[in-house]
Design a protein with these regions (language model features):
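RNase H-like (RuvC/DEDD) metal-dependent nuclease/polynucleotide-processing core
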Residues: 2-8, 13-256
């Protein structure tokens, strides 16, 4: 693929839906919020390359360490490897697809998903609160890639810390983006400096993120866009190589 003529999109889930950093041929990057992943795709050309920080391709059974991609990339990240969490089985992801109206219902659904996850994993493993929090977004992309196989050649899973590592000559970031749930300014500055070395203007990165997205969501989407460019140019690498496939034929790999 040739990135010179491709629209490149980097996406990450956020409170308002999805944050996307995009760049067309010869244009500066822009940032926008979309309420759904379908809306994001509808706003991009059919030949755009999209890299997204979200698991794609679900296992029927989960082994120790999660899917193959997670097990492969963790050792590269050193102290940052905790940012890569294991994905449970497809059955656990779809154990409860309700729209939760109370916190009690949310926790009850988490318990149900954990029960299914333990029954479909070896050793038995429940679902972390962090993983459960993005289940609905994983299902969004999963449903689209099942219904539209054409998307499988232009929507790619990536991971911010793996992407930063690849851009940093395969050296993991030294500082965390967050400490105890709060943004770590030093870690953010480290990543902004790396993004600037790869073509971003600091004024773009220093702007407040759109309403409904956090500052770290913005940087994650920004590095995803660079990964989309690497995929388009053929310089990105999938983990594993070649990618696996899930029960629906959806490719399973983290690209960076």
């Amino acid at each position: 693929m040739n990135s010179a003529g491709a629209v490149l999109v980097g996406a990450d889930g956020c409170k308002a839906g999805w944050i996307a950093v995009r760049r067309g041929p010869g244009s500066a990057p822009s940032v926008e919020i979309f309420p759904s992943f379908a809306a994001l795709l509808a706003a991009t050309p059919d030949d755009a390359i999209v890299a997204v920080d979200m698991p794609i391709g679900l296992p029927e059974f989960s082994s120790k360490g999660g899917r193959g991609p997670e097990a492969l990339v963790r050792p590269q990240l050193g102290a940052r490897q905790s940012s890569v969490f294991s994905i449970p089985s497809r059955a656990a992801l779809y154990a409860d697809t309700s729209d939760f109206t109370t916190i009690e219902a949310w926790y009850a659904a988490h318990r149900r998903a954990s029960e299914v996850a333990r029954a479909t994993s070896d050793p038995p493993r429940g679902v972390s609160i962090q993983a459960f929090g993005i289940f609905s977004k994983i299902r969004e992309i999963d449903a689209l890639l099942i219904a539209r196989p054409d998307l499988r050649g232009r929507v790619f899973e990536s991971h911010p810390e793996v992407a930063f590592c690849r851009l940093n000559d395969d050296r993991a970031m030294l500082l965390p983006k967050k400490i105890k749930g709060s943004v770590n300014p030093a870690g953010m500055a480290e990543r902004k400096a790396l993004l600037c070395r790869h073509g971003y203007a600091i004024d773009f990165l220093d702007q407040p993120p759109p309403r409904g997205a956090a500052a770290d969501d913005f940087l994650d989407a920004a590095v995803m866009m660079l990964t989309a460019g690497r995929i388009a140019s053929g310089s990105a690498k999938p983990f594993p190589n070649p990618p696996l496939a899930d029960g629906f034929g959806i490719p399973v790999a983290i690209w960076a």
